[in-house]
């Protein structure tokens, strides 16, 4: 059976991006002729969850932001291939492309590896937030590859909430009322996106055996006297439960999708999100972060 491929691209008016799309489309047209694959192209702004159902491969063209936003629609059964359309290697104004395993120059060879099972399959965990409303409805927020923010929708106002977490072996049971700038949660692979920019973590490393089950937590700009272990920062596998005392709050997944809640809602954050099968071709994602792993 021929492969069914969805290509999602970042829509802009940059010539470098247009050239990348031309190279990608040309390579795929050859595979349509030689292998009989089926392809569909759609802009990020037009894509729907239903577009991803039944696909054998999803190709995301753009940068890390494009990939993390699109990955929210992809379940655990569909491999994703990222193509950096404007690599920083070629232009200092380009994209770093941390999650992007391919580029226009290597795409023709890489996509064949992906179809033939020769790519590196990075099986990555994702954060999941579940909101229970005051009327008992349950809302699952989009899974986050990098990070989740839970805060007041008005960033100039403090976030008021109750924070709870069971003992995790490092910290005892947590049950605290806090006023902060919101709570940030990060996966191990996502900590470089935002978390390390607001936390002092110089030299901190993590056990390799815990990176699939644990996540990072911080209460942003928490008062100094409240910065107790586990309440201010944590590296934990236990779910965190937040009970809102805010008129309006929201969960933001990877800086993209927002899910709103009101006072009295509970938000449970854990590593129970669907895993993401991200394909790379020259190195594993985890190899890029070896300096943050205990040896």
Protein language model features and the residues they cover:
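Short, solvent-exposed amphipathic alpha-helical segments in soluble enzyme
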Residues: 22-24, 74-76, 199-204, 231-234, ...
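Short glycine-rich anion-binding loops that position phosphate/pyrophosphate groups of nucleotides
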Residues: 63-66, 86, 188-192
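Beta-strand-loop-alpha-helix segment that lines the small-molecule cofactor/substrate pocket
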Residues: 77-89
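ATP/nucleoside-binding phosphotransfer catalytic cores, i.e., glycine-rich phosphate-binding loops
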Residues: 150, 167-170, 226-295
